[in-house]
């Protein structure tokens, strides 16, 4: 199974996100902020598929989900989706990183540390 992201269950998001990670100094918690610029979920034809119910990160291990999903509007039109996924334990961080590794491999993404 390929790693994928969905906002409506059963409908894969094709636009690749910009993902920013932060982690507490002791490594116990972390936050991933996803930004999708002009995602296909905002397309008028896609809107007929249903409502955005959250962000679902799906891979062979299962589903990670967050309900923290917001649209960004420019001149009254939706232009981007921002979603925040919070990891509350080192195990949750490790699980998220395994998902991102698979998602990156599937979509040709690379990880780079901030300088």
Curated annotation (Swiss-Prot):
One of its GO terms (biological process) is photosynthesis. Keywords: Chloroplast, Membrane, Photosynthesis, Photosystem II, Plastid, Thylakoid. It is found in: Plastid, Chloroplast thylakoid membrane. GO terms for cellular component: chloroplast thylakoid membrane; photosystem II. It is a peripheral membrane protein. It holds the Pfam family Psb28. It comes from the Eukaryota. Belongs to the Psb28 family. PANTHER family: PHOTOSYSTEM II REACTION CENTER PSB28 PROTEIN, CHLOROPLASTIC, PTHR34963. HAMAP family: PSII_Psb28. NCBIfam families: PS_II_psb28. Part of the photosystem II complex. This is Photosystem II reaction center Psb28 protein. It comes from Phaeodactylum tricornutum (strain CCAP 1055/1). The lineage of its organism: Eukaryota, Sar, Stramenopiles, Ochrophyta, Bacillariophyta.
